[in-house]
Amino acid sequence: MSKIKFKTKSALKKRIKVTGTGKVKHGHAYRSHLAQSKTTKQKRQSRKSTLMNNSDFKRLKKLI
């Protein structure tokens, strides 16, 4: 008998990307609306994707 293989969560699959070194990239939060109250610097910096923290990555491993 083989071990059960769990499916990857589809919602997560659409939101993250794993780099070649195994780190996880994701987009910034708080970008969809209410942007007029944020500074230009906040809006500009949130365009780029960022790497996930190690503490979050440990929780995320179960979903991948």
Curated annotation (Swiss-Prot):
Keywords: Ribonucleoprotein, Ribosomal protein
Origin: domain of life: Bacteria
GO molecular function, one term: structural constituent of ribosome
GO cellular component: cytosolic large ribosomal subunit
Region (Disordered): 22-64
PROSITE patterns: RIBOSOMAL_L35
Comp. bias intervals (Basic residues): 22-31
HAMAP family: Ribosomal_bL35
NCBIfam families recorded: rpmI_bact (TIGR00001)
Protein name listed in UniProt: Large ribosomal subunit protein bL35
Encoding gene, per UniProt annotation: rpmI
